[in-house]
């Protein structure tokens, strides 16, 4: 997989579903990174539904992961000790914020009220391709985060590149 790249403005449909942008959907609908055991029944009852992992991120966004990427994250979490209070807390916080969503034949996923409330999304949203994941933001919240941190970009880029 080449990775998810780009940004698109979208709106929820009347049932609170998000249409995954076609350019992102192409990568996983073809089956990239999705193995046979990662397929579940689609919401229309077909046997070829693809699912994604949806997570509430600490910054107020939502993140979508394909199964193969999530499995790598899960391996890292499995290495944490349940007997170390910090590590146990991290695992609890991550798993509490996680759900599995099925992509229907039209490329839509349901977003529950819990997830919409976390992200502050009412109708409009921005989907950002961030290589191994898709990040979903409420547009004004994203604009505020970017504006508030605009001066940090050069320093951060200089530190990590």
From Swiss-Prot:
High-level lineage: Bacteria, Pseudomonadati, Chlorobiota, Chlorobiia, Chlorobiales
Coiled coil spans: none
Superkingdom in the source lineage: Bacteria
Major subcellular site: cytoplasm
InterPro entries attached to this UniProt entry: MraZ, MraZ_C, MraZ_dom, MraZ_N, MraZ_sf, SpoVT-AbrB_dom, SpoVT-AbrB_sf
Any one GO molecular function term: DNA-binding transcription factor activity
Family to which the UniProt record says this protein belongs: Belongs to the MraZ family.
Taxonomic source organism: Chlorobium limicola (strain DSM 245 / NBRC 103803 / 6330)
Keywords, sorted A to Z: Cytoplasm, DNA-binding, Repeat, Transcription, Transcription regulation
Protein name: Transcriptional regulator MraZ
Pfam families given in the database record: MraZ
Database matches in HAMAP family: MraZ
SpoVT-AbrB domain span: 7-69, 98-141
Ranges annotated as spanning the membrane: none
Location in the cell: Cytoplasm, Nucleoid
A GO biological process held by the record: negative regulation of DNA-templated transcription initiation
Matches recorded under PROSITE patterns: SPOVT_ABRB (PS51740)
Any one cellular-component term (Gene Ontology): nucleoid
Subunit structure: Forms oligomers.
SUPFAM superfamilies hit by this protein: AbrB/MazE/MraZ-like (SSF89447)
């Amino acid at each position: 997989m080449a990775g998810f790249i780009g940004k698109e403005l979208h709106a929820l449909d009347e049932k609170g579903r998000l249409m995954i942008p076609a350019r992102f959907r192409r990568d996983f609908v073809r089956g990239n990174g999705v193995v046979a055991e990662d397929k579940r029944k689609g919401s229309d009852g077909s046997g070829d539904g693809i699912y994604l992992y949806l997570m509430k991120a600490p910054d107020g966004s939502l993140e979508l992961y394909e199964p193969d990427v999530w499995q790598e994250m899960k391996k890292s979490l499995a290495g944490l000790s349940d007997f170390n209070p910090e590590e146990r807390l991290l695992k609890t916080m991550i798993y509490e914020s996680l759900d599995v969503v099925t992509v229907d034949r039209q490329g839509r996923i349901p977003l529950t009220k819990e997830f919409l409330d976390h992200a502050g999304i009412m109708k409009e949203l921005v989907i950002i391709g961030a290589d191994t994941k898709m990040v979903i933001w409420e547009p004004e919240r994203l604009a505020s985060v970017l504006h508030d941190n605009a001066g940090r970009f050069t320093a951060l880029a200089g530190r990590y590149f």
